[in-house]
Amino acid sequence: MNSDLKSFDKIEQKIGGSRKISNYIIGGMLTIGGIGFLLASISSYTGRDLLPLGNPSTLLFIPQGIIMGAYGVIANLLNFYLWYLVYINFGSGSNYFDKSSKSIEIRRKGLFKDIEVKLNFDEIKSVKLDISEGFNPRRRIALVLKGRKKPLPLSGAGELKPLLQVEEEGARLAKFLDVNLEGLK
């Protein structure tokens, strides 16, 4: 974000989606594991070793081969779903704030369609910092809207920025929108 947002009329924030290194690593492990389990199941059924390691042809097809086949099918279904999310870059998008027209556009890439939310500045009650530490930490910026109980998150899911950076971005955005900042303790 820009350092002095009061002097600018527009802000555009890019939000990263599911194309993260962790998703590539998990997808690769699921691919290898799922194919391995399916090959072990087929090997136990046909009696021929299709894997370079081990000796899966000696496994009994009932129950070990069937169970390994089920694990392989489940892993490959999860694998297909994860690679599809990475392919479409699920959750990516942008936040666009325009001071001259007093409008806000929030765009995200959904599972089957794009999601777009358009708001006016007068619909904003405040900017909220949602910060929780511990086992599953969360640091995000959200807009509190008038007449709505749940805040509208602006930062991407799973995005863990340093605490100071989140506080500075929240303060700058609240100053730009000319609303209060909530969530600081």
Curated annotation (Swiss-Prot):
Compartments, as annotated in UniProt: Cellular thylakoid membrane
Keyword Nucleotide-binding part of the UniProt annotation: no
One of the protein's GO biological processes: photosynthesis
Disulfide bonds: none
GO annotation, cellular component aspect: photosystem I; plasma membrane-derived thylakoid membrane
Keyword set, alphabetical order: Membrane, Photosynthesis, Thylakoid, Transmembrane, Transmembrane helix
Chief localisation class: membrane
Keyword ATP-binding annotated: no
InterPro entries in the cross-refs: PSI_Ycf4_assembly
Transmembrane segments: 24-44, 66-86
Membrane disposition: Multi-pass membrane protein
Entry's family note: Belongs to the Ycf4 family.
Function: Seems to be required for the assembly of the photosystem I complex.
Official protein name in the record: Photosystem I assembly protein Ycf4
Species, as recorded: Prochlorococcus marinus (strain MIT 9301)
Gene name in the database record: ycf4
